[in-house]
């Protein structure tokens, strides 16, 4: 499972009383976390990229980076998970003291979005072999990739959601 905003693909295993953590591998560049607890799968925040009141820090992936909301898809025929990704999307966050005002944002932060590499791509589709825990292939897009993935028994994947408004078909293998 591609985590929504952490930047890691999580491998989990069903157990009698819970869903257990097995492993995690980064699928986008991330600097906000210093590690992952091998027992629980919980990330540890890197203090160099954790905001405090009045201080600004950079962090990757941004609030829009990583997988975010679009759904990934699994194809049992190929054994691959296909993840819609926004790579190269970072941000800056500054902690602020705020006074609660009904109906307004109450985050206690000012955020902005940046590109880690202005010449690089932003959107991608990544195919991951979860048995090996590694990326098998990817397709890059110059714009964000906000579309979900659909995979078929005929070993195709379909996607949309880039700013060029194309609907794409790819070989799932």
Locate each region found by the language model:
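Single conserved hydrophobic/aromatic residue that forms the stacking wall/gate
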Residues: 1-13
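Repeat-blade elements of multi-bladed beta-propeller folds
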Residues: 4, 68-74, 78-85, 145-166
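Short, solvent-exposed loop/turn and secondary-structure capping segments
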Residues: 11-12, 84-85, 92-96
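Short coil/turn linkers that define WD40 beta-propeller blade boundaries
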Residues: 13-16, 79, 133
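Terminal amphipathic helices with adjacent charged low-complexity linkers/tails
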Residues: 19-23, 88-89
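Extracytoplasmic beta-rich repeat domains
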Residues: 24-71, 100-110, 115, 119-122, ...
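Short loop/turn segments that connect beta-strands within beta-propeller blades
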Residues: 130-131, 172-173
